[in-house]
Amino acid sequence: MAAAVSTAPRAPLPAGAVSSSCCSSSSSSASMSRRWDPSPNPSSGSGSRLFLAARRGERLRVRRLAGAAPAPAPRRRVSSVVRCGGGGGGVRSPDDADAGSGERRRGWDALFHDAFQGAVRRWSEYVGSHWPLAPAGKDAGLGKRVESRREEQVRGEVEEEEGKWSWERWKQHFALIEESERLVDELQLQLRTAVYREDFRSAHKLKLAIAATSKNDTVGRAISDLNSAIEEERYMDATYIRDHAGAGLLGWWSGISGNLSDPYGLIIRISAEHGRYVAKSYDTRQLNSDGPGFPIFEIYFAEANGGYNLQAVHLKPDDSDSQQLSNTLREKLGMDSINISSSSFGAKHEDHNEGVNMDDQNSDDSDISAGPAGFKNLPSDSTPVPRVKILKVVPMENVNQDYIIKIFDQMSDEDDENDNPEDEIESSEDIGDGDNVEEAEAASAEDNVDESGDESDIEALISIDFITEDDKDFMSPSSTKAFERMPARLERRDRFSFSFYTEQYSKRQDVEKVQGISKEKVGLRTAQQDDDDLQFDRVKLVGSNRKLSVLQLGIKQHNNKVQQKLYGVTHFSRIQIPVSSDPLTGLYMTASGFDSEILSLQRKFGQWREDDSSEEHRDLQFYEYVEAVKLTGDNLVPAGQVVFRAKVGKHYQLPHKGIIPRELGVVARYKGERRIADPGFQNPRWVDGELLILDGKFIRDGPVIAFFYWTSNFHLFEFFRRLKLPD
C-alpha cells in the first residue's frame, strides 16, 4: 500500500546541486519503492515499481477526500515520479505535487457545495408549491394578532410577577370556585345522609373529601384563621387577616351613590360564602320579614406570593327583568301598551294626556262590566304569574288624601297578616273570578254612569295587589346565572368605610335613566323610590263606549321585585348597631305602611350645624342633642341628610301631661326641628317640631318615638319603631 504525502515548501537549491539532488532523489525513490513493494522482484525494473506506487498514492488521496479514514501513518512520505534532467530540463518538485492536490481538494469542495445548494433550492420550490404565501394584508393582520397575543402574554406574566391577576385569570378562578362550591354542597348532603344512617366510616371519608375540595376556599380559611387568632390572643395576626383578607368587610353597610340624581341609598349586608364575599341589598319589607336580599356585588380573594389578591365583581342584572312586569301585564291581560306617566295625586283629566295607556286588544261593543278581554280565563302555565286582586273601587268624588292613606294602610296591614290566606281572599275580589269583577265594576258604574247611557268618563280609584303563585318571585332571578360578572374596584378608606366603583359599561343608558327618573314624580314621591308599591298615574281601559280613567294604581310588590343596581361610585359606611337600650340611639323605621324609610339616631354633644354658616354665634353654648340621619332617602330629603334633630336633656324637656293623650304613652317631649324641601332637595329649610319618646306598651311592636312638626299648611305626626338587623 502506497501513499502520496506532500511536504512543506523548501528553498530552491543551487544549480550545482541539482545533479546530486537528482541522483540522491532517484536513489531514495528506488529504495522507497523497494520498501513499499510487498513482493519485490529483482528482475523487474525500478520504473514500473515507481509508477505503481504513484497510482496507489492517487487512489489513497481520492479515498481520503471522499471521507474514508486512512490508516494512521507515523510519518508523511513523498511518493511521486521525479524526472531528472540536465541543463534546461524541467524538474517536478514536491511543491508541484502539493499544488495539484490542493486543486483537486478545491474541486471536491465545490462539488459538495453545489449539491447542497441544489438540495436547498429544490426543497424551497417544493414547499412553495404546496403552501402558497398569504396576501400582505392577511400577513399584517396575522402579525398584529400574534403581536397582541404576545403583548397580552407578556403583560399577564408581568402582572403575575407583580402579584396581580388579569381578568381572564380571574374568570378561570370564578369557574373554579363555582365548581368547588357545587361539589362541597353535594358532599355535605351525602355527609348528612351518612350521619343520619350512622355510617360513620363513610362520614369520615366524606369529611376528608370536603376538606380536600375546600382547599380553594380562601375566604373560609381566612375566617377560620381569624377566629383561631382571636381565641389564642394573637391580635397582630387577627389584624392582618381583618385588613388584608377581607374579614373586616363582614356586616351591615349603608350606601350613598356618588351620583347626585340618585337620592335613595342602599342597605347591604356582606356575608362570607365559598371563596368569596357576597353583598346583598335589602329593602324595608325584607328587613322586617327576614327575607332574602338581592345580590349586587361580590369580592373574591385568592392567595398568591405569600399574600392575598383581591378582585371586586359587579353583578349586573339582566335588563330584561326590569320590563318583565309590563310584559306580564301586556301578555296576560291582553293589553297593547303600558307606559308610566308623571302626573300626581289629584290631577285632573286634562293633565293626563301622557298617562299610562292599557289598550284592550279585543275592543268590541260589549259593556265595560263584562271586563276587558284577557281578564277572564287567564291561561295557566308553569311560569309563576302574578295574581291580581281588586281591594277597593270607589268613585273619585268620595276620595281625598286621607282616604288614599287609608287605602295604603289597609294594603300594608293585609301584607302583615299572612297567617290566614282565606281571610285575605274573602276580603278582596280575585280578578280571575268573572262574577267578582262584574260586581266590583258594577258598584262603581252605578254611581257614575248616566241614565241616558251616553258615553262618559268614569273616574275611580282602584287599588290592586299582585300576589305571586307558589311563593315564587317572578321578577327575581332564580340563580346567580341571571347575572353578568363585570370587573369593579373596591377602595378601602378606613375600617368603617369603603368605596365601590363599577365599570362604566353603559354611560349613555345611565344618563337616560337618570333623566327619566327625575321626571317621574308621584305627588311628593318618585316612582323608583317606592319599593313597596309602584304607582302608575293613569291607566285607560279602552272599551267600546266607556273609558275608565284611573288616577292611581298601587301595585304592591313582594320579595324585592324592584332590583337595586349600582352605577358609577357608591360610598358605603358601616352601620353601628348599638348594644344599649337607649331609645335615642339606634336604627328606626317609619311605621307607615306606604312610606318606609330607615333612620339612624345618634346622641351627640356640642352644637348642631346651622344652614347659614356665615352667621356668627357670639355665645358658644354646648348642649346634648340627637340627630336622625336618613339611611334610605327619597326625592325630597336624600339619603345621608339629617331629617330631624332635637336638643335633649332636663333643661330642654317640655311638659306633656295633660297636653298629649295618655293613650300614646308619651314618656318625654323635647323641642326640635324638622327638615323639609321641595322635590329634588331644592330649597331645604328647617321647621319647628317636637320629639316624643313613647313607651310602646299599648301597641305590640308599636312605635317607640314620634316626631310632630307643623308648617303653614299642615300638621303631621311621624311614628318610628325599632329596627333590629339580624346578626
From Swiss-Prot:
Residues 19-33, 42-51 have a biased composition (Low complexity). Pfam families: Cyclin_D1_bind (PF12014). Residues 1-83 form a transit peptide. The keyword Transcription does not apply. It is found in: Plastid, Chloroplast. One of its GO terms (cellular component) is chloroplast. Keywords: Chloroplast, Plastid, Stress response, Transit peptide. PANTHER family: PROTEIN EXECUTER 1, CHLOROPLASTIC. This is Protein EXECUTER 1, chloroplastic.
